[in-house]
Amino acid sequence: MNKEKHFFRRAGAVVFWLAVWQCAAMAIGQEVFLVSPVQALRTLLGLVPRADFWQRAGFSSGRILLGFALGVAVSTVLAALAESCPAADTLLAPVMQLVKATPVASFIILALVWVRGVSLSVLISFLMVLPVLYGAVRTGIRSVDPQLREMAQVFRLPLSRRLRAVWLPAVLPAFRQGCSVALGICWKSGVAAEVIGLPNGSIGDALYRAKITLSTGELFAWTFVIILLSAGFEKLFLALLDRLSRAVLGEVPQC
């Protein structure tokens, strides 16, 4: 019953803001400035049957998710290293702070000096994910019960048993929450990199073309696509992570 109430409340909120959008579009009366949600949906449905739509979606998804995967792997290794070695913690702290504080646009422009536009979204997605998951994994490691760690050392448990009994139950909840945040960030930053780098056949390139041709309907349609891809991949990844957690630990990590 509570789930149904929550669903209807959220659906009602969505309908309310769509109505506000529709009224604003009708009041302005100029599609160049603001298209209605109905027109944006029509434009999106017109894009879907086209082959280049799927090519662009696949091109951008592949590179952004590659950047995310690299961020997951590198941040996990660096977080474990920083927690086990004070010298590594000292060396990595200013780097992570720098990455967090530097604007995405600055990274994109600087990165264009070293990498081609086709690889730019991979690098930028990786850089934006890195400090988020680095902090999340470190938070999880620090939450491990010291008594459990001591017990594992006393009984000389093998590494596989330590991971399942001590480390993963503590790290996975923080890691899951970090991934939820990082996936949204990497999509926004990755598409921003494509808009500036303009690799052919990308979603960012389509957004830029829609902007310079004043095709506001396409601009909103591609924005819908980005939102749907981001939300869809986030739900899929978290579902796979929960399934893996059940297989390894017998339970889903509680965030």
Residue locations for each model-derived region?
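Transmembrane alpha-helices
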Residues: 123, 127, 160-193, 221, ...
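Short cytoplasmic-facing helical segments at TM-TM junctions of multi-pass membrane proteins
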Residues: 136-175, 207
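Periplasmic/extracellular loop-to-transmembrane helix junction in inner-membrane transport proteins
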Residues: 27-69
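C-terminal transmembrane helix and the adjacent membrane-cytosol boundary/short C-terminal tail
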Residues: 86, 177, 221-255
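N-terminal signal-anchor transmembrane alpha helix
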Residues: 5-28
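Non-cytoplasmic
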Residues: 178-228
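Transmembrane-helix boundary motif in ABC transporter permease subunits
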Residues: 66-96, 109
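Generic hydrophobic transmembrane alpha-helix motif, especially the helices
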Residues: 97-132, 139
